[in-house]
Curated annotation (Swiss-Prot):
Belongs to the TRAFAC class translation factor GTPase superfamily. Classic translation factor GTPase family. IF-2 subfamily. Residues 32-453, 481-514 are annotated as: Disordered. Residues 192-203 have a biased composition (Polar residues). Keywords: Cytoplasm, GTP-binding, Initiation factor, Nucleotide-binding, Protein biosynthesis. Residues 32-41, 274-283, 412-423 have a biased composition (Low complexity). Residues 625-632 are annotated as: G1. Residues 729-732 are annotated as: G4. Transmembrane segments: none annotated. This is Translation initiation factor IF-2. Residues 127-143 have a biased composition (Pro residues). The keyword Cytoplasm applies. Residues 675-678 are annotated as: G3.
């Protein structure tokens, strides 16, 4: 009871000792709003429900004894299955009408809520059952509206088989038609036969009654004029019904119907003349379904021709209970609501295949209605029993069996007797069938609960309903239910495998994910073909880049490195040995991308459209050779200028482009010279110079011979496929040996013409100017052989030789024009950089308005510093140039990223070792140079420094002057600013002093690299080194108390107090420690020199012996040097 004076449904059900469902059904019939067991209702509504339920219980408890005889009659009435099937539809209609009339009198007010099914049963019995005189009276049609609604539900169950034209008539059963009485039954013997309940009618009234009552459809409509409609249907199945009514033992074998099928089986009993009201009252659509002739027979239920088991009757009772629910609504609604009711024309719509546990509970309540006497068969036996005596089983016994039946589902089939077999005495028909159905359709727990409820509440009802169940129609219902029963059994096994699958999924979730990942990986590997050979550019790649080149996942490389003891990330750079180790593990050989690749000519400057306008152009000559072999001096001699004298350190550190005009054969001829650095750090510059050259002049010092950079220059020239002219320089020096140089060059497959080869070799002296003209003549001769041509009438194309940022002029690029003519104002794109030529100057500083093929100029007007080595091309308008630049933007970003990553290049082997020792040290640098080529050279040189213990990290590298921004970055990161041939912007010096940033400026790359290496060594912890002091020999041992003192003679060096000593005895060390006491003539002294005697004492050693050798040394700190791995 709630605080507001209301009561909840579950509280009311506890008070009444009923299930929540029963109370909800009663509320529904009384139109009381109650959605669930927790809904609250007022006291008045609760009283109404109590009254309704008490009336139903009173009706149920009244006729237990009668139910038993009815059971006996039912078993007697069993008829041939064929007759039952034919008659069932018509019987339903007749039954519905007769049932309606009977139900009204039987339970005009009381059974409406819960026992409408009973009234229907009573009406069935009314034609013949003397026990229920009230029910037989059709006069109480006034009350039938409620009861009628219930019957209507049964008919609504759509029991009317397509063959039944009268089925609709029963629905209009609202009409209280008198045909319900036996007279109507007499009109249609078929109806009596078809409805199992009509069997009782047949017993008392012969064939006619069965016809009237047996219509299950008429039960749907209490007042329906179903009887008239029945005659039409009976005509179809008249013959079978007489047989069913007249025959006490129907042809159908009485199979112990499953709990659900039994209710349907009860409907067949209703087909019997006396029992037809039962099917009607069984708004549970099962009864109606059973009445349908086409209803399939379920396993465990009696089939046509077999006697119906008492269990069927019980099921029928359950259905009436459902009909009580439907009473609250419409009969048709009940039938529709029933899940088991099929809508097929061949089966009654109200028929429910299995009896749900809820239905069983409902049936128990209606059991209170048994006040109506069970219908009797013509022979006088009650319809409910197979034998008059057998059927009279006390309801108590049935109740006892009901709970046990579900526990033994296998017992039901045994209960189903063969046609005409007598039912087991003392066992209610509904009990076994209901249990069997419950077991088939519900889980064991639900089945037990429902069966248990039935046993407690429906003892009397069970007896009555079992008697009312029509055997023949029950058989029909059983058949119809049997079909769904099989699929249900199939569903159950199917559900088990499903559960197993679910378990597998839960158990193997991670495995499934791994499997999918492996499948995806395998698919990718199948699609991707690994290269036959891996070419590594500049001996460095990141993990991700290596993974892309090998067409594998980066995680595979990381895993491989991990197993090698190296921890890496996808952005980590790998050195060449590490790359080779990883690639070989995946079966791909590694070939280092030699700088020769950079020297190859990748783009043909001459196009097909230029062929008609080609003219001879000046050659581009690159002067190459080892450092200090005289390349720039040779060019000075040719140009008659002194460039080498003004260059820092006397060495060239970036490419110089010069154009020289000479007189050849009386005609002026031009030659463009490119001077490349000879230092090993400028390999990339030499490669770029070779890439654009037409002729390579190899300078070799006669007194030095072939050196490493000489060999590199030879490889560049061969990669560029350009002819080589050898200039043997410094022939004027002492020790010069041109012949030795020729011999060494021949070892490199460069054979002099004098020795029968094809390589021109000219001995020259740049200082004295010897043979310079001969060298120029040889260059022009080779040029004529090469037939160098270009089209000056087209837009210019060429290569960026060098680029830098000038603080006054902005970005400046040295351009070599290889085809066409470059003019002031031209719009050009150099890689991803857009530019418009604002001004051009030649090597002498003279301004030019245009420059033709093979011209080398410095151009101003670029948006940013272009990359050295990029090719440029002039476009007719700025729009088209911007389109090209936009397409190259992504590549440019990748290039910049590569440059940044170059500053972080790490040898993973060294890094992992440092990390394990906790000694990983870094030197942060900010590098600014005059030109980009210098930046590349310095970065390349830094890569050559040992990195086992200290890693150089370049935070920023760019051409240009040192700015205040650079100083701020260095202050924030603790970096050192290194400038190469550059200056500091205004404010940068002041900012550096204020923040304490170290700024170093260099003009020679040697010094820069030396200082950086020293700085790296400064980060290393100094190491302790043993420094020998002297040696002494023990001559005597003196014991002083517990200790001993050794009298020694200094044989070499000296001994100092507190120094480290090592005592050797027979070449073995017996003690090593500190010298604690040093005395001479009983005086403590700090040291004793060679040739003197002294006494030595050590606190931790007293086992002195004569002839022991004492070695004295001290530990000193020493600066460590970088050790290469």
């Amino acid at each position: 009871m709630t605080s507001s004076g209301k009561i909840r449904i579950y509280e009311l059900s506890k008070d009444l000792g009923l299930e929540n469902k029963d109370v909800l059904h009663a509320a529904e019939k009384l139109s009381i709003a109650a959605k669930s067991h927790s809904s609250s209702i007022s006291d008045d509504e609760a009283k109404r429900i109590r009254g309704l339920l008490r009336q139903g219980s009173a009706a149920n408890s009244a006729p237990p004894s009668k139910s038993e005889p009815e059971k006996t009659i039912l078993s007697v009435k069993k008829a041939a299955p064929t007759a039952i099937k034919d008659v069932a539809p018509p019987i339903r209609k007749a039954t519905s009408s007769s049932e309606i009339s009977h139900v009204k009198p039987s339970a005009p007010a009381n059974p409406i809520p819960t026992s409408p099914a009973r009234p229907s049963t009573e009406s069935v019995a009314h034609p013949a059952p003397p026990t229920r005189p009230a029910n037989p009276t059709p006069t109480p049609t006034s009350s039938p509206p409620k009861t009628a609604a219930r019957p209507i539900n049964a008919p609504i169950s759509r029991p009317a088989i397509p063959s039944r034209p009268t089925a609709p008539t029963p629905r209009s059963a609202n009409k209280p038609s008198s045909p319900v009485p036996p007279s109507a039954g007499g009109k249609d013997p078929r109806a009596g036969q078809t409805s199992t309940t009509s069997k009782a009618t047949t017993v008392s009234g012969g064939g006619p009654r069965p016809k009237i009552v047996s219509r299950p459809q008429s039960p749907t409509a209490p007042g329906r004029s179903a009887p008239p409609a029945k005659p039409s249907i009976p005509s179809e199945r008249k013959a079978p019904k007489p047989e069913l009514v007249g025959r006490p033992k129907p042809k159908r074998p009485v199979v112990a119907p499953p709990s659900r099928p039994d209710p349907e089986g009860q409907r067949p009993d209703k087909k019997r003349p006396g029992i037809s009201p039962r099917p009607i009252g069984g708004p549970n659509q099962r009864a109606n379904t059973s009445q349908r002739p086409g209803a399939p027979i379920r396993q465990g239920k009696t089939r046509p021709g077999q006697p119906r088991s008492a269990g069927n009757t019980l099921e029928l009772v359950g259905k009436p209970i459902r009909r009580d629910r439907s009473d609250a609504g419409s009969a048709g609604r009940d039938s529709n609501n029933r899940p088991g009711a099929p809508t097929r024309p061949g089966m009654p719509t109200g028929m429910r295949k299995p009896v749900a546990p809820g239905e069983l509970m409902q049936l128990q309540k209606p059991t209170g209605r048994p006040g109506t006497p069970p219908p009797r068969r013509p022979d006088g036996t009650s319809v409910g029993t197979r034998g008059g005596s057998e059927g009279a089983t006390p309801p108590v016994e049935r109740t006892a069996t009901a709970p046990t039946a579900p526990k033994r589902p296998g017992h039901r089939p045994a209960q189903a007797p063969a046609a005409g077999a007598p039912r087991r005495p003392g066992r209610p028909e509904w009990d076994d069938s209901a249990k069997l159905e419950a077991l088939r359709n519900k889980s064991p727990q639900k089945q037990r609960q429902k069966v248990h409820i039935i046993g407690e509440n429906d003892d009397a009802l069970t007896a009555e309903t079992s008697g009312y169940a029509g055997e023949k129609q029950a058989v029909v219902l059983t058949a119809s239910l049997a079909r769904p029963a099989k699929p249900k059994s199939q569903k159950k096994p199917a559900s088990k495998p499903v559960a197993a699958l679910r378990k597998r999924k839960k158990e193997t979730t991670r495995q499934r994910q791994r499997r999918r990942a492996m499948e995806l990986r395998a698919a990718r590997e199948a699609k991707q073909v690994r290269p036959e050979m891996l070419i590594v550019p500049e001996a460095n790649l990141t993990v991700q880049e290596l993974a892309d080149m090998l067409s594998i996942e980066s995680s595979e490389i990381i895993k491989s490195l991990f197993f090698k003891g190296i921890t890496a990330t996808v952005t980590q750079s790998l050195d060449l040995p590490t790359i080779e180790a990883v690639a070989e593990e995946f079966g791909v050989p590694v070939l280092q991308d030699d700088i020769e690749e950079a020297a190859k000519k990748t783009t043909e400057m001459i196009e097909e459209t230029d062929l008609a306008h080609l003219i001879r152009r000046p050659p581009v000559v690159t002067v190459m050779g080892h450092v200090d072999h005289g390349k720039t001096s040779l060019l000075d001699a040719i140009r008659k200028a002194r460039v080498a004298a003004v260059e820092a350190g006397g060495i060239t550190q970036h490419i110089g482009a010069y154009q020289v005009e000479i007189d050849h054969g009386g005609q002026p001829r031009k030659i463009t010279f490119l001077d490349t650095p000879g230092h090993q750090a400028f390999t990339a510059m030499r490669a770029r110079g070779t890439k654009v050259t037409d002729i390579a002049v190899l300078v070799v010092a006669a007194d030095d011979g072939v050196r490493p950079q000489t060999l590199e220059a030879i490889s560049h020239a061969r990669a560029a496929k350009v002819p080589i002219i050898v200039a043997i320089n410094k022939t004027d020096k002492e020790g010069a040996s041109p012949e030795r140089v020729k011999q060494e060059l021949s070892d490199q497959n460069l054979l002099s013409e004098e020795w029968g080869g094809d390589v021109v070799m000219v001995p020259v002296s740049a200082i004295k100017g010897e043979n310079i003209d001969k060298l120029l003549e040889m260059i022009l001769l080779v040029t004529e052989v090469e037939d160098l041509q270009a089209n000056p009438d087209r837009l210019a194309k060429g290569t960026v030789i060098e680029a830098h940022l000038d603080k006054a002029k902005g970005p400046v690029a040295t351009l070599l024009i290889q085809n066409g003519t470059l003019k002031t104002g031209d719009v050009l794109a150099a890689g991803p950089v857009l530019g418009k030529v604002r001004a051009m100057v030649d090597d002498s500083g003279a301004r030019l308005k245009e420059a033709g093929p093979s011209g080398a100029v410095e151009a101003l007007g670029f948006s940013e510093v272009p990359t050295a080595g990029d090719e440029f091309e002039v476009y007719p308008d700025e729009k088209s140039a911007r389109v090209v630049v936009g397409e190259r933007a992504s590549d440019a970003r990748a290039t910049r990223l590569a440059q940044q990553m170059a500053s972080r290049r790490v040898s993973l082997a060294a890094m992992s070792g440092q990390a394990s020792d906790g000694e990983l040290k870094e030197l942060n640098l900010i590098l600014k140079a005059d030109v980009q080529g210098s930046v590349e050279a310095i970065l390349g040189s830094l890569e050559q420094l040992p990195k086992d213990e200290v890693q150089v990290r370049v935070l920023l590298s760019a051409p240009g002057e040192i700015t205040e921004t650079d100083v701020d970055l260095a202050a924030a990161s603790g970096a050192v600013i290194v400038g190469f041939n550059t200056s500091m912007a205004s404010g940068a010096k002041r900012a550096a002093d204020a923040t304490g940033v170290d700024v170093r400026d260099y003009d020679v790359i040697y010094k820069l690299l030396e200082d950086i290496q020293m700085a790296m060594e400064g980060l290393l912890e100094p190491e302790l080194v043993e420094e020998s002091l002297g040696e002494a020999e023990v001559r005597a041992v003196f014991t002083i108390g517990k200790s001993a003192v050794a009298g020694c003679y200094i044989t070499a060096g000296k001994l100092q107090r507190n120094c480290r000593v090592r005592v050797r005895r027979a070449k073995q060390v017996v003690f090593e420690g500190d010298l604690d006491s040093l005395r001479r003539n009983k005086d403590d002294v700090k040291e004793v020199a060679t040739g003197f005697e002294c006494g030595i004492g050590c606190d931790r050693f007293a086992n002195w012996e004569e002839r022991d050798i004492i070695e004295a040394h001290k530990l000193v700190t020493k600066r460590r040097t970088l050790s290469s791995s």
